[in-house]
């Protein structure tokens, strides 16, 4: 707070150290895999054909969504440095014929289009308010008419005082990122509304650690 800048830098996929990068990705995969087992079975994607897993890293969610929806294919969009590890995980899952990987930076580059589902899991908290709004706008623009956009985040109460885990995670983003933060339901809904989306609501799922899906 005194310096108005992060006090430390998190491990990330954008590092030249291959071992550090794969360690980070494996950690993210293990977390995402455990979360996906709880959330994906309760999300109805029947009739949907092509999912964008934005910032999907190793494709853990794409893998689970495809397993639960036999007619679904998916594209994971993440940094090019993620590709080798992601493609190995996807191949090991037996999904290489249904899940592809596109390398790029969703904060600075346009996204491919033609999707009828976009899945944004735990990527907005690493970005500031304006950047998060722009990410949601890009994701919405990648959808065909009638497309569905889903955002999974640690969601703060509207007064920002809780629940405990999203509030503590908000502090973690303060010390670890330039502008990252946890967001409230109203803020996430605002991003979606300003991106031209309709029928915005939080799904009635009981997920751990204050996690929610819009």
Where would I find each of the regions flagged by the language model?
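Alpha-helical subdomain
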Residues: 45, 50-214
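Conserved Class I S-adenosyl-L-methionine-dependent methyltransferase catalytic core
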Residues: 1-49
